Amino acid sequence: MATHSTNEFRGGLKVMVDGDPCSIIDNEFVKPGKGQAFNRVKFRNLKTGRVLERTFKSGETLPAADVVEVEMQYLYNDGEFWHFMTSENYEQHAASKEAVAEAKQWLKEEALCMVTMWNGVPLSVEPPNFVELKITETEPGVRGDTATGGTKRAKLETGAVVRVPLFLNEGEIIKVDTRRGEYVSRAK
């Protein structure tokens, strides 16, 4: 199995720590005036989402995590699991509530997502950067009602709630940035 030395540690590198796959968030090289140099490393556990901080002596190694990012199509939610399919071989995988997390509010059937896999199990799901969703609930925009800054709340078909301009009505399809959860434009 491949290993990574402390001088190869970079943000985003996937390594195994205590038997769990982790992603390095931050790596700081420290050379004290007296004593051996060391690295102070911040990790995110990909299974639990927890952030850990550890120190490693200069030259120590960690095994590489066999983590793969695969583009998959979202199929459906059966109440407990979210089901995804790879486009190449039509293999299906079930992602848990923890793996889907915040992405569930942006998932629409047939959407292409990036799924982080470890040993054949989905660890996390990243929705597309932009999605087109239908407005299912919003107040009617009243002309001249701009005291609130010209936006109103709108509930989308997936259950997500975003702020939209007053001119949008129920039934319209809008483009939303999933990274910030903001309205971008009307869908063309």
UniProtKB/Swiss-Prot annotation:
Presence of keyword Protein biosynthesis? yes
What's the protein called, per UniProt? Elongation factor P
State any GO CC term: cytoplasm
Q: Which residues carry this modification: N6-(3,6-diaminohexanoyl)-5-hydroxylysine?
A: 34
Q: Which CDD domains match?
A: S1_EF-P_repeat_1, S1_EF-P_repeat_2
Q: Name one Pfam family in it.
A: Elong-fact-P_C
NCBIfam families under this entry?
Answer: efp, PRK00529.1
The pathway entry for this protein reads as: Protein biosynthesis; polypeptide chain elongation
What family does this belong to? Belongs to the elongation factor P family.
Which residues are in coiled coils? none
PTM statement from Swiss-Prot or TrEMBL: May be beta-lysylated on the epsilon-amino group of Lys-34 by the combined action of EpmA and EpmB, and then hydroxylated on the C5 position of the same residue by EpmC (if this protein is present). Lysylation is critical for the stimulatory effect of EF-P on peptide-bond formation. The lysylation moiety may extend toward the peptidyltransferase center and stabilize the terminal 3-CCA end of the tRNA. Hydroxylation of the C5 position on Lys-34 may allow additional potential stabilizing hydrogen-bond interactions with the P-tRNA.
Supply one GO molecular-function term.
Answer: translation elongation factor activity
Functional summary from the UniProt entry: Involved in peptide bond synthesis. Alleviates ribosome stalling that occurs when 3 or more consecutive Pro residues or the sequence PPG is present in a protein, possibly by augmenting the peptidyl transferase activity of the ribosome. Modification of Lys-34 is required for alleviation.
The alphabetical list of record keywords is:
Cytoplasm, Elongation factor, Hydroxylation, Protein biosynthesis
Check the record and name the SMART domains matching this protein. Answer: EFP, Elong-fact-P_C
Q: Which domain of life is it from?
A: Bacteria
GO BP terms: namely: peptide biosynthetic process
Q: Principal place where this protein is found?
A: cytoplasm
Give the location in the cell.
Cytoplasm
Q: Which InterPro entries match?
A: Elong-fact-P_C, NA-bd_OB-fold, Rib_uL2_dom2, Transl_elong_fac_P/YeiP, Transl_elong_KOW-like, Transl_elong_P/YeiP_cen, Transl_elong_P/YeiP_CS, Transl_elongation_fac_P
